[in-house]
């Protein structure tokens, strides 16, 4: 039996879609030196090649893909979006505006100089910025802009062509820039990271190991009684001196949880909780007492939970003000926008921040109730909230404004982005509402993006040869300019106008470009994860601004004719 693969694919859109995705994802795993192609560019290249052979896909699949992607981007940005606007994120907001605004302006100037249409110009901007939100925003606005069908088809083809030609240029140039730009300034990033670490009392070791606290029991001997000198536990401040705290005391056979007024006595058995290295550093006064094994004394359930910051008595306060150790809990990690932050006593907490805390289950629960809630380790997604806010986003996108003879529609991209932000924001404030496991959110976002990339590649593939011959060289040069010049402008603005610490600044610049590979290089150069503070500050707002940039460049373009 002979199987005509071409006829089989042309007759089955679903099969064609998943063949493109599978081949593209395989291609995306290839590496060019230290640079991995990535899923987006892999799927785009395969779809362009198959598009040249006149394979096509239903446009409804393409639209659903971009809608899912942009909605999930909003959900991820939601918890931190408003805090960046309304509190101490002014510098991060300004950096993101400078980065995105200068890139959009340069792209429009180059588009006019080279005589491109809006499709090539917006596609080049999206590729040079390695930003699929720009591509999604521009594509959605073009579809609702009232263009004639033939002009719309050409603009959409040019949009994906410009993105495909400049994406790798944008990615590689930014990675190279992240590696060598720090060496061109007077301050090296390692020194800058150490400086801010000294100022804030940070742990500069990005490879800091995290252990679960352990519990050990000791019998109070004469050395420890002499060391205590009659002071109660509150006056002794045992945790500050040893890194351990006393969880339980057995005295005269009676087991009790001590309060701050308790005084150690000869013959007491005490249960100390702390990290292994803290036990190893215990003062000889403790070690000279006999270590004991008491099943009841050591019977304690140590748990590690992720606590989401929500309550007003924690939001806006510094980490040190929580006094977690005073409540018998140990902080392991601080996570913001999926980025692990340095454990900094001066970090101001935002709604939606995640604190990984270890300690006795009862104590951890008490701390969680005080500052927020324990993240639900559930595999069940609140599909009702997901669908409801998705519908709201589509309805917002239908709103249009009329100015004389000119009409402007919000569009699906902006509507879904706003609805996603609201869902993410509400989720950060209400633990039982709108829960979406991070794995599920990542899967839907990635799948939506891959479907969208497959669709635009297949639709643009037929004309790629003509496009390469006509504008290929111009595109590569323009992509390099749009990729690097805004980064230089942003650096000058942050260094000499905002006077930011260099390590924080470079992290914020990579966040404004939403480029995780470049962020890894900055962290390696600084030998610290301190730049992650800056990256997390600009990342959420940059995702939103880049989507709006794709919409704005399409709206502004006709006025430049």
From Swiss-Prot:
It is a multi-pass membrane protein. Belongs to the AAE transporter (TC 2.A.81) family. YbjL subfamily. It is found in: Cell membrane. GO terms for molecular function: monoatomic cation transmembrane transporter activity. The chain crosses the membrane at residues 8-28, 37-57, 66-86, 94-114, 158-178, 383-403, 406-426, 447-467, 478-498, 540-560. Its main location: membrane. One of its GO terms (biological process) is potassium ion transport. The lineage of its organism: Bacteria, Pseudomonadati, Pseudomonadota, Gammaproteobacteria, Enterobacterales. Keywords: Cell membrane, Membrane, Repeat, Transmembrane, Transmembrane helix, Transport. This is Putative transport protein KPN78578_08530. Signal peptide: none annotated. Pfam families: Asp-Al_Ex, TrkA_C. InterPro entries: AAE_transporter, RCK_C, RCK_C_sf, Transp_YbjL_put, YidE_YbjL. Residues 202-288, 292-373 form the RCK C-terminal domain. GO terms for cellular component: plasma membrane.
